[in-house]
Amino acid sequence: MTFLQFAYKNVTRNKRAYLAFFLSSAFSVLIFFTFAMFLFHPALKEGYLNNIAKKGLTAAEWMIFVFSFLFVLYSVNAFLKSRNKEFGILLMQGITPGQLRKLITAENMIIGVMSIAAGIIGGFIFSKTFFTVGAYILEMDALPLYMPWKALGITACGFLLLFFFLSQFTILFVRSNTVIKLIKGTGKVKPEPKPSVLLSLFGIACLCGGYGMVLKGNVHGAEPFIILLLTVIGTYFFFSQSSIWILRALKKWKTFYLRGKNIIWVSDLVYRLKDNARLFFIVSIISAVAFTATGVLAMYKSTVGAEESAYEMEYLSYSNNPKEQTHLKDIDHELKTHGFTYTKDKIDVSYVRYQEGETVPPVYMISESDAAKYFHVKVNGLKEDEAVYFPGTYDRNFKNEAPDQLKLLNQKGELSDQKLSVKEVKKPLISLNAIIAVNDQTFDQLKSLGDKASLYGYSYDHWKDSLEISQSLQNEIYGNYIDVHSDFASKAGTYYDTVQLPSLSLFIGLFIAIVFFVAAASFLYFRLFTDLDEDRERYRSLAKIGLSEREMAQSVTIQLAILFFFPFVIAVMHTLFALRTLAVEGYSDVAGPLSLTIGGFFIFQLLFFLAVRSSYLKKMNK
């Protein structure tokens, strides 16, 4: 038998332990490779959105690679610790430290090459679905398949180097131990975890404080940051201290603890929660971020509609604007150069402000005749002191609400004696700002309160294709934001800011969260099967004094269920409290997408739990 064959036999003989490592590594390679295929796709070479998407995907690639580095480091170290006894015996039988180093390197490279091959093959198979989902979420044209030589080379070389250098690094953990320590293996008796009561209560208090601030409503200013800080700190101490403290309290509750199988799973769970506290903390926070992002994106998509604007492009010129004609010529030139056939309207508006508490929001005032002529909106029957309010699609007020009464200011910023009652709130007309429509007589009387302005509206087809020229015009019009006498907005720009950019963030975030989920489940698998022999011996001893196979299975099931779903439940709680602020404000459209995302993660977690439980019980019963 050659040395390489010996290494291969070791891998196949320890396939139970290596299986989760192999599958998780292959999954990391698959995600990295499919992201790389997306990143280097020929269709993404041009375009403003495509450039932003490439930057986001590049950041995601680095995050996945760094995470893969930490994941492989942890996994290899865990495997080496579980095989300390085997290494000690090999050293006693005459294998040299150099040969042992070569053996470990060969084993890791075998697993690495197999993982890379499986991940790349899986990436090819999965790529069409990935491209379809990515294009759908980002609302781009469908991406065709191609031969990704660059993505293939970067993935293969990057992960080969990753596995090689990490195998060299982890050898240090073995070389630092004596033969006696290696032979003892992992059989050392662990002391029972003793949590700090003070830190346990502190963790619970932080969570209660964060949740309480959300429940009181009206979150503003620095409060969101304080809530986030309290939640993160509270979650960490809840997993590392409070959960252990609660289990120790259950042990003191004799009527519960000494009843049937409870004594077994509670005692075992104390150690396992302590061992996995940091892992649970990371998974719960990342999952909560992914779930919350889904809800926020759903709110954006349902409340900020670029399509609601009457014009594809809007330019507002205030009085005494020296660059008005220059800007209008630039807009005409860009639209004509890029092949857009358009029409242009000019609307006289009055730029006025009204008092709302301590703020003085701006609003564009137009006459009811112009509202009917240019926006095809009927607001007939308005009295002299009445107005119809149209929020802007880019307005901060996503709920389409308005004050019952508008107390208008004059051009000096002083409160005038003119007040308008809001008769009705309708859908937005433009992206730039809110509009109020008044009858023609009232408009003539009140327009002098504000700054005279001209609103130019451009209408054309295929507005989603005008993002690049919109960005170019916006940079030209606003310049360095000094001495600006105009405003500019476009459907494409609004749509990009409120839908496509958040969608890109969610697209990347969800896949990174999936990688973390898979890795977390794999970590649990490693922990369980590393301690399998010790657990089997303990249950055999308990069976001799009356523990039935059914009770053993129930004890294992309870422990695994808590280990798999505990961080998931905490993440869902964080998400529900985070999104409660939206519910308080009246946003009810987050439930569907949020339920779909959480349900998807739950089904994945459930399937992994059932698979691990089945495999673990089979090994325990041998």
Swiss-Prot record:
It is a multi-pass membrane protein. The chain crosses the membrane at residues 20-40, 56-76, 118-138, 154-174, 195-215, 219-239, 279-299, 498-518, 558-578, 590-610. GO terms for cellular component: plasma membrane. One of its GO terms (biological process) is transmembrane transport. Keywords: Cell membrane, Membrane, Transmembrane, Transmembrane helix, Transport. It comes from the Bacteria. Induction: Transcriptionally regulated by YxdJ. Induced by the antibacterial protein LL-37, probably via YxdJ. It is found in: Cell membrane. Pfam families: FtsX. The complex is composed of two ATP-binding proteins (YxdL) and two transmembrane proteins (YxdM). Belongs to the ABC-4 integral membrane protein family. PANTHER family: ABC TRANSPORTER PERMEASE-RELATED-RELATED, ABC TRANSPORTER, PERMEASE PROTEIN. Part of the ABC transporter complex YxdLM which could be involved in peptide resistance. This is ABC transporter permease protein YxdM. It comes from Bacillus subtilis (strain 168).
